Amino acid sequence: MEPANLSNLRGSSLRGSTRGSLRANSNSIWRNNGVEIFSRSSRDEDDEEALKWAALEKLPTFDRLRKGLLFGSQGAAAEVDINDLGFQERKNLLERLVKVADEDNEKFLLKLKNRIDRVGIDLPTIEVRYEHLNIDADAYVGSRSLPTFMNFMTNFVETLLNSLHILSSRKRQLTILKDISGIIKPCRMTLLLGPPSSGKTTLLLALAGKLDPALKVTGKVSYNGHELHEFVPQRTAAYISQHDLHIGEMTVRETLEFSARCQGVGSRFEMLAELSRREKAANIKPDADIDIYMKAAATEGQEANVVTDYVLKILGLDICADTMVGDDMIRGISGGQKKRVTTGEMLVGPSKALFMDEISTGLDSSTTYSIVNSLRQSVQILKGTAVISLLQPAPETYNLFDDIILLSDGYIVYQGPRDDVLEFFESMGFKCPQRKGVADFLQEVTSKKDQQQYWSKRNEPYRFITSKEFAEAYQSFHVGRKLGDELATPFDKTKCHPAALTNEKYGIGKKELLKVCTERELLLMKRNSFVYMFKFSQLTIMALITMTLFFRTEMPRDTTDDGGIYAGALFFVVIMIMFNGMSELAMTIFKLPVFYKQRDLLFFPSWAYAIPSWILKIPVTLVEVGLWVILTYYVIGFDPNITRFLKQFLLLIVVNQMASGMFRFIGAVGRTMGVASTFGSFALLLQFALGGFVLSRDDVKSWWIWGYWISPMMYSVNSILVNEFDGKKWNHIVPGGNETLGSTVVKSRGFFPEAYWYWIGVGALVGFTVVFNFCYSLALAYLNPFDKPQAVLPEDGENAENGEVSSQITSTDGGDSISESQNNKKGMVLPFEPHSITFDDVVYSVDMPQEMKEQGAGEDRLVLLKGVSGAFRPGVLTALMGVSGAGKTTLMDVLAGRKTGGYIDGEIKISGYPKKQETFARISGYCEQNDIHSPYVTVYESLVYSAWLRLPQDVDEKTRKMFVDEVMELVELGPLRSALVGLPGVNGLSTEQRKRLTIAVELVANPSIIFMDEPTSGLDARAAAIVMRTVRNTVDTGRTVVCTIHQPSIDIFEAFDELFLMKRGGQEIYVGPLGRHSCHLIKYFESNPGVAKIKEGYNPATWMLEVTASAQEMMLGIDFTEVYKNSDLYRRNKALISELGVPRPGSKDLHFETQYSQSFWTQCVACLWKQHWSYWRNPAYTAVRFIFTTFIALIFGTMFWDLGTKVSKSQDLLNAMGSMYAAVLFLGVQNASSVQPVVAIERTVFYRERAAGMYSAIPYAFGQVSIEIPYIFVQSVFYGIIVYAMIGFEWDVGKFFWYLFIMFFTLLYFTFYGMMGVAVTPNQNVASIVAAFFYGVWNLFSGFIIPRPRMPVWWRWYYWANPVAWTLYGLVASQFGDIQTKLSDNETVEQFLRRYFGFKHDFLGVVAAVLTAYVFMFAFTFAFAIKAFNFQRR
């Protein structure tokens, strides 16, 4: 049959449905002998099934594709509608099709292919070509790339001048990919290999059509001869990122289902219609299960899809399908499972080409093998196209690939069949050793440090061959020549299948997109119900405080002053309802990374995401506002008319919706918390200051009046005031006037008293709501995330590859080392004392978790280590291994004294003396698995800091620096000396460089014993080799080193001298030497009857974990713990423990005069030194704060211009106080909230450094608190001088210094309050929520909204406990408290302040003392909390 032309499919399938129904004698269908019929158990069943099938065949095409025959558990077939398949039915169907993923997947895919082939339908294929591809980026190099305060300012000005073409850019061009060409063929698996920063991710992004527009690209990429602009590449191909970005509140199944619904079914439906038509014409009856599967896979819009279930199964995610994905805040699935969810998210779609970036990070080798194998089957059988980059592929995974692309330094060193790659390198003089994985060899052979060990031409001297030379040699190699010939012949476009390339931008229709996004938003709101409940309760508490503060019995309505108090209450109501929308800011930003990923993958347009997040919040608003109005309205004593009650309710609903829309918009524009909260503060400040309450309209300057008219707050406040003061209770005439009291009050504040202003306000707010939400949608559509990973390049003088060739990693018992490390020849600058560590019968248990008790666990304690014994000696490298949950990290934490809870029994000795944690911390180092370092210091500074605090006091600075230099050489960190550490995954060092820094930070402490937790996890083969070489060099200096290790390659595993193997449940099953090529280990396990022999060339580490698995133990009926306990090895180890457990003659127990190696003062100086660099190089915090302060100062200065000189009426004083009130609140809250993320990041570093015995908590707190003082001082002076001069306060030295003093201490206590918030809570999110609540209370009791004399007696005590009230008291009393000028009503300024606010000038001394006390109180609380609370759980 001719290949199907799928463009005519829909037409042909519908024509088929109108032809006559099946003939009555439909049995003739089954008499076609050439067709394979899947027979059932009995003839009768067959006949019944045939009748049902015949009935199905009579249906019109569209209905026929929606129905199928499903077999029940008894084997009877029933007709089902595809859309009505239940969970159990889908599960049973998959059980029949793919019972065991590894075994049955291929059979299932072949059945699918068989059905398609039988009627001669051709599957679409994609061939991807890239020709002469060059990709360049612009970057700052050397010290200019460090984000110091000065660089930030210089780069900012420079970028501005560049855009105006005044100055040329100082950025250097960096070439990522250099003139590369190649072909990715369908039906073949391509493996992309290359060392870090060789351009793998960039190549994959280029092939998938997802490159960053800022990059300069020349050359072309084409699919089946069509260039990327001729179709939609993002939907034709799927790019799977190496970053796992998911919404933590969704389960694994929900994540995949959402993705499947958004991506749609592609051309599956058309293909099925054509298939069905041809089968009908040829009298072919398909397998019923395959038929149902294909129909379900081709049905759009199903919430629960068979394809999703299938992908979950082959990725091994079916066991955690209903578990939350989780994130930093929510406990969820493991890292390896998250990686698989990222892969599954794209596999559920209809893409024919897959570009997968490092999909195996965090997975064990057997899982990686089974996933890659499933992908291979799918690619080869269903004619897909795949390029997969892997970090450390095991030999068996490597062998699954057909083609290899090897990238190095932006050049393609080799591209072609896997079988020819070794031949190419042998022709260049490099040979892969026998016990070396080919993939590992390929990653190392182009690296300057690793190349020499593979040189095989013994008769020629070795010279380093660059990536460029390899790339040139490849062109003349036979594989390269063949590729060149193929590229010379263009792809024949006429052979491109019409269904191969996608032209629609989205997978489903607009209505369906909106439905899918709405359902997800609803689900997330349910999952986040805690946030909404928390907001409700916070609002309830504030409502209770507000109504008891403005209690009706305490609120007369006789004078304009009384009206002013009511106006204050209404103003506060508007503020509360507006600021309650602020949580939208954080929630929007939190979801942005996932949104950007899904938007760029064309899952949905931005409007489909924006509309549900607006519409679904309306019911929340109704509840919040309803709660507030019902609680406060009548208790405060607002106008009792029910219409006015409902009008206030309506107005506040619109206010809340407007605020939520505004915060969403700000979040989408700001994109990070820092920028958004700064922008948010600006927007709020302008609204707040120009809302007509803080500064009366009559006093707004002409150049700011536009701000007054566009401030949503003005409309809100005006409407709510009119609604209240237009009521009956306020319509009596004021004595000596001709206006009602209500009208007078509204006018005195500069508002409009006419009743129609209520509706003007409501209308304006509705308009703002629509505009903000529309702009939110636009911002989502057109803005991209800020943070891009960036590399720090050395300047030309500092060549990155300046290290000489280091030794190969080998174990001490005789590996084939080519050149020994130099460190053996010369001793280190600082001597150290070698120590052994022995532990005998160590038991570790924790209290039984509540969940396990509920499941029926009877014991009180859960035992994690069951009597473990062993000895670690100097100069011996020990690997601590076992399956997940065996207790490797637990044992290490117990030995290192890092556990914060639980019960430890048994004896641990150091060189024969019982271990004391205080002294042990001084001679030991612990390299944690997650590399935690201060992000804003350089590599060299990190090491100097660690050495400064951990080496003894008698080591002078010169020796210390020499020692640091030695360690840097040992760990090969020389070229990165001035590189900034940075935040993981955002900027700074790569994973492998961070690992080496972690090791170096411990080494500079000159420890005798070092523990390392998974030093090679998440690294590629080359990086792992560098880290292991570092570890080996460390052991060769005579130290005791223990590493937990997970899935090592052969050469990493055999670099160890001894193995400590544990099984699940915390018991040891082998403790002893490995031997050459692991001979001792293999001999020990093979001597057990029934244990499978190791295959030639197989990895002993993998084999050992396989043969000791609990399933194997059950099968063989042996317990490896018992086997070990009865072996000679165990007895030998016990003898060794006894021998090392006795102190050597003449030795002394470890003893140090002090707990820390440095004095308290030195600790303080060192902590302050590190904080200094951390702040200086963090412009996102320090520079933004200064810019923000300067802007606010200029805004206030121009807004309240020259108001300080006006003191003719009471409103002037209220305006002046308003300027102080707004400034204090905004600057203070901005300081408090912006310091929190900085402190939160440093706190995690503090936990590691304190555990290492570097310093006590007080010096750390001292450094953190002290470094703020100069920055805040400059901030106060900046602000003070600008504002004082522009507002025109009296130029009196005393008053000016009072102003500066109060501003300085106010900003200090706000900043320390923010720091304290972090110190007393487990994480930054909780800290910001707790802190925010108090800002609201402080605002209410500050004395501006309701002065102290008007507060009810039962609340006055809180006025005195409120720091903001003291600040306002000080600012107003110092400026105006002694002025004798008369106001319009014959009262002096001094008398008015005493009567109305209760402010006295002679009370300033007390104010100063109280403000100072607040600063000390918050700083001390911070220090105490840091010392007392440890929120790290181990």
Curated annotation (Swiss-Prot):
Signal peptide: none annotated. Its main location: membrane. ATP 2 binds at G882, V883, S884, G885, A886, G887, K888, T889. ATP 1 binds at G194, P195, P196, S197, S198, G199, K200, T201. It is a multi-pass membrane protein. Keywords: ATP-binding, Membrane, Nucleotide-binding, Repeat, Transmembrane, Transmembrane helix, Transport. Induction: By the phytohormone methyl jasmonate (MeJA), defense elicitors (INF1 elicitin of P.infestans, flagellin of P.syringae and yeast extract), and protein phosphatase inhibitor (cantharidin). Repressed by protein kinase inhibitor (K252a) and cycloheximide. Residues 161-434, 837-1089 form the ABC transporter domain. The keyword Hydrolase does not apply. InterPro entries: AAA+_ATPase (IPR003593), ABC2_TM (IPR013525), ABC_trans_N (IPR029481), ABC_transporter-like_ATP-bd (IPR003439), ABCG_dom (IPR043926), ABCG_PDR_1 (IPR034001), ABCG_PDR_2 (IPR034003), P-loop_NTPase (IPR027417). Belongs to the ABC transporter superfamily. ABCG family. PDR (TC 3.A.1.205) subfamily. May be a general defense protein. This is Pleiotropic drug resistance protein 1. The lineage of its organism: Eukaryota, Viridiplantae, Streptophyta, Embryophyta, Tracheophyta.
